[in-house]
Amino acid sequence: LIDKSEEFPSKKIVSIFVNPLQFDDSNDYMSYPKTIEEDLEALEKREIDYVFVPTREEMIENLTESNQLPWGFSNLLCGSYREKHFQGVQKIIRELFQIIKPDFAVFGEKDFQQYLLIKYINKQYFQKADFQIILSPTIRMDNGLAFSSRNIRLSDNQINHAAVAFQSIKNTVLDYFHETSLFNFENLIPQPGRITYQYVKLYNEKYLFDKHGLETDDNFKQKNFRLFIALVIDDVRLIDNYRVERYDVT
């Protein structure tokens, strides 16, 4: 995200806050990696102007009530598995933007549904035409697994196992889709074992924007699709997505 931000002429502020409102399971919140000292040490080596590390009380005590989110945030992808997750994210991101008042904000492509939420928050509450929300490409390990805060909870063996699982189901589903133009992937998903797939979904990007209360912009087209995968390896949940470009199912 920092590398991507360097493309834009602006002061750079990194915010670090593990949002308790976005966790449905208190155990998940407690086990989520919190590496503030390591983060600050790493940031010292980068050209960052400010680091914003608010306390829980500073971010939560005086939150403004937020509106109900569009259908997609509770019925599609992570929204269908994590009740009130995006409502919790909305409250904190809205507060963050009110405090910082950014001209640019950089978010990762791996969390694509969160990116849609950020765009919705700007549309709903700020309506700043000159506020640019930047989508930063997913950074991957050599084995193809997307970097994630949760990876720190995985052993080397688990990391390699997860990478194979993502790549395998991706190849299987896309081969099937390109051959048939069908979306019924249920029979292609392996039975739960060490790895359990929560969802494997392929959506048209315009459909995603529509269902999340947004209009499609020039970077997202009718003919582009995106494959979303969520899996749990042992007790660690990982997500990823891949853009499928220029495939016309009509």
Go through the PLM ranges and name each one.
Residues 188-250:
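Phosphate/ribose-recognition catalytic cores of enzymes acting on nucleotide-derived substrates
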Residues 1-194, 207, 235, 242, ...:
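Nucleotidyltransferase catalytic core that binds NTPs
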